[in-house]
Amino acid sequence: RKYFSTHKNVNPIINVSLGSNETQVVWHILSESYQLTENTRFIKTYDDKSDSPNKRFKRFSIKEIPTNLISDIGSNFKIFKETKSKSRALVNRKMDAFIKTGFSILLVGERGIGKSQIANESVKNNKSFVQANCASFDDDNKAEAELFGYTKGAFTGAYSDKKGLLEEANGGVLFLDEIHHLSKMVQAKLMKALQTDKDNNMSIRRIGSNKETKIKCRLVFATNRTINELKKELLPDFYDRIVQHVVNIPPLRDTIEDRIQDWESIWENLHFSEEPAVPKDTNLINWLKKLQLYGNYRDLQKIAMYYNVFQNFDEKKKKC
């Protein structure tokens, strides 16, 4: 850790043994720091049969990685364009790093913070983006049928073959919001699908079929629970699998420096019929900056709609 924090411009060559705890440490540092570049080389050495080297890393924790490993390099991921917030810039950099891989991603953030928009930005080259809210699945049967699909005659009402959401998202991204609402049974089945082969293909099976279908899609999960709360609600193995690449999205009350930008973005995206200019009254902006906005973008949207109605009303009154 000391080496990486003091030698930021060096392209290291790292020698590790395959399958060891050292390897896991290296990949954790790689995924969390983004300091390492494509010039960093990992070389597999001999297979170490002894236990002694592994013992040095038994107490290693992700939390020990210093924050100064996270570089200030630019990012191609711009959900928060021209942000002045360090926490939002970190979201951009993390997403930029993760979408270059085929790994699943977990978005953690409060309601109304725009998790679906961030997930949508992870889609490459106009490929498919499929989304579902896990809270909408009434029971396990519906959840399984929606996710994995079914064959004709698999159950009462199955009048024809139907693709599941996983197949629909083949080649693209499947976004599952409120993942904490999935039952343990569905988590177990989904966990099996997450076990990909060497080519990063998933194997899924429709209800009523004996045939496995290979697909390739990225799963982006989202929750408004904290990580500790989520851990209590998910199967341990499923939890361990989906928290490997976590992106924490800051609430609007923690990104005051971007409040004007957020206001302008919300206003422009509402598509008012008369297309009024974005209000930039000093008193209004100062007031907006004082708001906590616990509903995040939804609260800001309500304010914009309310303001537009009464601004137009006042303008029309002046003309009378």
Q: Which stretches of residues belong to each language-model region?
A:
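Interdomain "pre-motor" coupling segment immediately N-terminal to P-loop NTPase/helicase cores
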Residues: N11-D72
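Conserved AAA+/SF3 P-loop NTPase catalytic/coupling segment centered on the Walker-B
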Residues: D139-A145, D161-N200, C217-F221, I227-D240, ...
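A broadly used, surface-exposed interaction patch
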Residues: R1-I13, T37, K316
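Conserved post-Walker A coupling segment in P-loop NTPases
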Residues: N76-T156, G172-V173, E178-H180, P251-I256
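Nucleotide-binding/hydrolysis machinery
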Residues: K100, I118, V123-N126, I207-R218, ...
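Structural alpha-beta junctions
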Residues: T6-K8, S33-F42, N125-N126, F272-E275
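Short gly/ser/thr-rich secondary-structure transition/capping motifs
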Residues: A154-S160, D197-R206
